[in-house]
Structures are given as structure tokens and as C-alpha cells.
Amino acid sequence: MSKAPPLRLGVNIDHIATLRNARGGRHPDPLRAAFAAIEAGADGITAHLREDRRHIRDADMQRLKAEISKPLNFEMAATDDMIRIALGVKPHAVCLVPERREELTTEGGLDVVGQQASLGPAIARFNDAGIRTSLFIAADPAQIEMAAKLKAPAIEIHTGAWCDAITDGDAAKANTEWQRIFAGAALARSAGLEVHAGHGLDYATAETISELPQIVELNIGFYMIGEALFVGLGETVRAMRAAMDRGRAKAIAA
């Protein structure tokens, strides 16, 4: 039997804030969603404070840090302003992501190789502050190796291309992307990085990727918030947790 570590579920609540902001005001409250997710079994809460504040706002991050009982993962672009805000909030972790104002969601992985001169000092500042840093990257060997060189504690593998290929019915592309993820997770772990994954995951893909023993955390948001409209957030978190547990059980039995 292999030694697969426990697998954490981070619930991204950005799109609770998207719905709130569509009408203004305070309802629905992202903090209430965080409480519900944690009660249902989430191991942490993820929120992305974008530069345009299109969903999560500064006050949301402060409230989440002050009131939730589980770790807060602060997704952010590595800008001077966001670094200053994150150091003030002092979350358990930050996940550095690429960001473009015109995108609907994070479209690709961070170019760690191309941005090493700016990312290195940012990672060092967070490490010094006791805030764990992960880098949201494609499962590309050069990016993974640079993440390790810059002393990032963790990476989050971008699973979007794999999930999109499955949704589109493109089996060949899905297999190619899966092989990249499979190899990338192994390379990252051998380089001493903690390995997370996320973007576009649903119940089926979360179960599949949970079979990779190197991965210790999945961060999932949009699919779960969509499902919650029909069955409730608590039930969605429990169903996702069950899917992950089924996948991890296969890894342990292998």
C-alpha cells in the first residue's frame, strides 16, 4: 500500500461575492458561505482579491481572517499593493496568480520563469512573515523547477486545460493534459514542493485527481457554487469531500 497523505478541500467563495455585487448591498454574505462550507467539512477557505474588486472586497478578507475557524488562502496578483494588503491581513497562505482585467477568470498559470526577479522577493517577504506561499502554475517542468529555486513552499497545478478537454469531449487532449499533471505532480514533490491543484474541477475530475498521492490540497469554487444553487452549499461540500475520499482511497490501495 502506498503512503498517500490526507487530502484537504479548500472552498473558493468568490462567486458568492459575485452574486452579492450583482445587486449591491450585503446579501448573500461570503462570510456566511464560509461558515457553511466549514461546517460541512471544508478544510479551508479560498478567496481572490482581484485588483478590480469584481467579487471579493478588502473588507471581506478582513472579516474572513478574523472570524473563520479554518485557514484562509488569499489568492492575489503579486503587485506591490496586493502584497501590502496581504501582509496586513496575515492569512494562513497566499496563492500568487496571474491576473488580467479583461479575463472572466484566471486563464493561465503564472510565468514564474519570466517573473522570477519580482516573484523571488515577494515569496521571501511572505516566508519571513510566516505566510505560506503557493504559485498557481501549469504543470510545466521549467515553471516547477523555478518555483522550487525561488523557495516557494507550494505550487497549485492549473487543471483548467485538462478539465476543459474532458468537457469538450476531446479525449486525446485530455489524456495529454493528464499526463502533464501526472508528471508535474511527481516532479514537484521530488523537488520538495507541496502540491495543490485547482481550476475547473467537478465531482468526477476531483475524484480522478485525488488518486495522485503527491497532491495534498484541492481548491474548488465555481462548480460547487453552481451546484449549491440546486442542492445547497453544505450538500455540495459533502459530495465533493466524498468524491475526493473515493479518489484518495484508490491511491492508498494502489
Curated annotation (Swiss-Prot):
The record marks E156 as: Transition state stabilizer. One of its GO terms (cellular component) is cytosol. NCBIfam families: pdxJ (TIGR00559), PRK05265.1-2 (NF003624), PRK05265.1-3 (NF003625), PRK05265.1-5 (NF003627). It catalyses: 3-amino-2-oxopropyl phosphate + 1-deoxy-D-xylulose 5-phosphate = pyridoxine 5'-phosphate + phosphate + 2 H2O + H(+). InterPro entries: Aldolase_TIM, PyrdxlP_synth_PdxJ, Pyridoxine-5'_phos_synth. Pfam families: PdxJ. CDD domains: PNPsynthase. Catalyzes the complicated ring closure reaction between the two acyclic compounds 1-deoxy-D-xylulose-5-phosphate (DXP) and 3-amino-2-oxopropyl phosphate (1-amino-acetone-3-phosphate or AAP) to form pyridoxine 5'-phosphate (PNP) and inorganic phosphate. Homooctamer; tetramer of dimers. Its EC number is 2.6.99.2. It is found in: Cytoplasm. GO terms for molecular function: pyridoxine 5'-phosphate synthase activity. This is Pyridoxine 5'-phosphate synthase. The active site is at H48 (proton acceptor), E75 (proton acceptor), H199 (proton donor). One of its GO terms (biological process) is pyridoxine biosynthetic process. HAMAP family: PdxJ. Its main location: cytoplasm. It comes from Rhodopseudomonas palustris (strain ATCC BAA-98 / CGA009). Keywords: Cytoplasm, Pyridoxine biosynthesis, Transferase. Belongs to the PNP synthase family. It comes from the Bacteria. Pathway: Cofactor biosynthesis; pyridoxine 5'-phosphate biosynthesis; pyridoxine 5'-phosphate from D-erythrose 4-phosphate: step 5/5. 1-deoxy-D-xylulose 5-phosphate binds at D14, H15, R50, H55, T105. 3-amino-2-oxopropyl phosphate binds at N12, R23, G200, G221, F222.
